[in-house]
Design a protein with these regions (language model features):
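N-terminal signal peptide c-region/cleavage motif recognized by signal peptidases
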Residues: 4-5
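Structured, acidic catalytic/metal-binding patches in enzyme active sites
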Residues: 11-222
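A cross-kingdom marker for long, charged
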Residues: 216-273
């Protein structure tokens, strides 16, 4: 799908409220970047400096039990194997794909399809939230430096349930897309990242549309449901007059049922910086 040719006066994927007692920033990020993508546009620094509280997708406070929780969510119970949950064609495709990444079948046969996608190719905007060069990680360090209060939009359990509770058919589609289009998806994300750096919403919006057309069920779990829950969760802070920055993947601020539009429907107004 071609990205719409739109022009933007803005230079970042950051929005600031224009009709609230205290500033509210919506900070769209790319979870996985490289060192050459820095420094970031000034609006990212401004959003952290101007806010009393910075809310990330997950609480940045380390959870020593998170890996064990992930493993429990990622595997089928009672020793079930993935083969029982896949179409025969997908099963055959999977064996061809795992040979390319040199996996040991006995080590991965109990994982759910989405977990294999995450381990082998990555799930856009989900499993790389805490990437060392990601914007979220960078802004977390900035918030610590400025002594800001920090919190999470969802608990670790809620974050894991997004995937663990996904129906097999949606998880299988996610795995197939990762195996078949992995290299192409990487090239597309490079285009999305370049657009994100200059505040161009066209390619990020087109990428969300492509993903929804391919696997609507998964996208609704990854984006729509979480957007609705998050907006309801932090709106009381806005009403109380607290200055906040909401830091999340840029896909949460474009496309259907995005956080920004959910707030605009409730009367809040935002300008893109």
């Amino acid at each position: 799908m071609l990205a719409p040719t739109l022009s933007y006066a803005a230079t970042s994927c950051v929005w600031r409220s224009t009709n609230t007692p205290a500033p509210v920033y919506l900070v769209g990020t790319i979870h996985a970047l490289s060192g050459k993508d820095y420094p970031l546009p000034k609006a990212y620094d401004q959003a952290i400096r101007d806010s009393k509280t910075v809310l990330f997708e997950q609480d940045p406070k380390p959870n020593p039990h998170y890996r064990a929780l992930w493993e429990r969510a990622a595997k089928y119970p009672n020793g079930e194997e993935i083969g029982r949950h896949l179409h025969a064609k997908t099963y055959k495709l999977m064996f061809a794909a795992i040979r390319q990444v040199s996996w040991d079948w006995n080590e991965i046969k109990y994982y759910r399809p989405w977990a294999l996608a995450a381990l082998g190719w990555g799930i856009r905007g989900y499993n790389d939230v805490r990437g060392s060069l990601g914007v979220d990680n960078h802004l977390e360090h900035l918030a610590k430096r400025f002594h800001k209060q920090m919190g999470g939009l969802e608990s670790d359990a809620e974050h894991l349930e997004v995937m663990r509770g996904m129906p097999d058919i949606d998880a299988e589609l996610m795995l197939v897309d990762s195996m078949v289009h992995g290299p192409k998806n990487k090239a597309q994300m490079e285009q999305v990242t370049a657009a994100w750096k200059r505040g161009d919403l066209g390619p990020p919006t087109a990428e969300v549309a492509r993903s929804r057309q391919l696997n609507l069920g998964a996208e609704i779990r990854l984006l729509d449901y979480r957007n609705l829950r998050w907006a309801k969760r932090f709106e009381p802070r806005i009403k109380s007059g607290e200055s906040i920055a909401v830091v999340a993947g840029s896909a949460h601020f474009v496309g259907p049922n995005n956080v920004r539009e959910l707030l605009e429907k409730r009367g809040y107004k935002f300008e893109q910086l």
